[in-house]
Amino acid sequence: MFDDVIAEKLKELGITSNEFSELVIRMLDYGVINREESQIETRLYDRYLQVTDLVEDYLSVLKVKIQHDKKFCFIRIYPPGAVVPGLPDDEHNAFNSGFRAKPSQQEVAVILTLRVEYEKSLREGQVDDKGCVLLPVEGLAIAMKNLLKRSLPEVLGERKSIFKRLRQLRLIQFNSELEFESADSWISIQPSITSFVGDEVLSQLYPDETTKGLIEDVL
């Protein structure tokens, strides 16, 4: 019955069931769609705008939360029970694991540092028209050392793995040919990081540098 209702509404919108399935599967598989990421995600994001209500109804059955940033054109989904800034909490659901593996401690440290650096650039007006912030890898390493007393991995393969993971989460972007050992290497921090690391965590990190308690709780 539910499928019949969806099929009927899709027909009215001129969207095929395969196109709808492609969109939903991509959202569940990747957890995020960023219109600026690629031609594929541009197409899927635009399709989402056509079927927003249907996708929300469909995923609400699974108690999946959808966060849609219309300004920077990205969608991120969260599992049932996840605490999401700006979205109501589900107090009656104990499930709180992600669709994919949670970030490692090292990844969390990099993410927190990126969030602080993004906030600094935002306050200084050093954000481009797409809401992105350019940061040299060397600058990230220094900031991470100063803020959290941690270092980026010395092994290049481990360092690349972290950055690829963060790109998968649509938190950063970089040239595929980038070698992360060069002082001239740059990454682009994406605006979606503001929803990934909420204001409560940020307030403990910036401008107050007393982060020992936060590190013990998060890392």
Predicted regions and their residues:
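Short alpha-helical segments that sit at the start of domains
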Residues: I6-I15, H92-V133
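Short amphipathic alpha-helical interaction segments
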Residues: L49-V55, R150-Q168
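Short, amphipathic alpha-helical interaction segments positioned at domain boundaries
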Residues: V84-G98, I189-L219
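Leucine-rich, amphipathic alpha-helical/linker segments
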Residues: F2, K9, L13, S17-L23, ...
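A short, conserved structural fragment
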Residues: V61-H68, F163, R167-F180
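Eukaryotic partner-binding/assembly regions in large regulatory complexes
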Residues: M1-N96
